[in-house]
Regions:
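Hydrophobic alpha-helical connector segments
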Residues: 54, 69-97, 152-159, 182
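Alpha-helical DNA-contacting segments of helix-turn-helix folds
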Residues: 53-59, 66
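Conserved amphipathic alpha-helical interaction elements at protein-protein interfaces in regulatory
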Residues: 15, 19, 36, 47, ...
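C-terminal peripheral helix-coil segments that are non-catalytic and often amphipathic
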Residues: 92, 132-139, 157-193
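Helix-turn-helix
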Residues: 8, 16-50, 54
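Amphipathic alpha-helical packing segments from all-alpha helical-bundle domains
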Residues: 64, 68, 113-143, 153-157, ...
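N-terminal positioning helix adjacent to the helix-turn-helix/winged-helix DNA-binding module
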Residues: 4-5, 9-12
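Amphipathic alpha-helical segments used for helix-helix packing
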Residues: 95-117, 168-172
Length: 193
């Protein structure tokens, strides 16, 4: 029963934070929906902020675990193909549960003042972790037989921009972007890099 209650608190809080934002969500609303007293929530989480960051970290750790599960790519594959494959895998992950990305996006677009600095620091940490994993997956990145190690961060940033654009389009239009569209956009985008 304990895990069930904790799960209900977690998923209800996730939904309320996603729908209403951090500031408009309060412990009373969570208690009412879950059917528990505030003391039950405080048994599992120290505060609303603690609960919020538990959800935030859970989502990012799930994403990092997914990224770590992607196999290292052959070093002879061109950078363009490696980055495209990673982009497709990321899109697949986002599509599997778009609400997680909506939660993260909302946190970063509308960060509550009282926790904005913590959100920024956590974001920097998780992006650095993601970039390390991406570099590991890619092995020795090459493009046109030149090592581009010194410029790889620029490539990663540019790829992240395209990924963010595609994610934004999926969230705002509520339509999954198909592989054909991603492929066309990728070809255009990569040539502009």
């Amino acid at each position: 029963l304990e895990n069930s209650t904790r799960d209900k608190i977690f998923y209800t809080s996730f939904r309320l934070f996603l729908e209403n934002g951090y500031e408009a969500t309060n412990i009373r609303d969570i208690c009412k929906e879950v059917g528990v007293k505030a003391s039950t929530i405080y048994f599992y989480y120290k505060s609303k902020q603690d609960l919020f960051f538990y959800i935030y970290d859970y989502i990012y750790k799930d994403y990092i675990d997914y990224m770590e599960s992607i196999e290292t790519m052959d070093k002879n594959i061109h950078l363009k193909e490696k980055l495209y494959t990673l982009l497709k895998k990321k899109i697949e992950y986002y599509v599997s549960d778009i609400s997680k990305r909506k939660f993260i996006l909302r946190c970063h677009m509308f960060p509550p003042e009282e926790i904005a600095n913590v959100i920024r620091e956590k974001y920097k940490f998780y992006i650095a972790e993601e970039n390390k994993i991406i570099l590991d997956i890619m092995g020795n990145p090459q493009y046109n037989d030149k090592f581009i190690t010194k410029n790889i961060n620029s490539y990663l940033i540019k790829c992240k921009k395209l990924e963010d654009y595609l994610l934004y389009e999926m969230i705002t239009s509520n339509i999954r972007i198909n592989d054909k569209v991603v492929s066309k956009l990728w070809d255009i985008f990569f040539e502009l890099m």
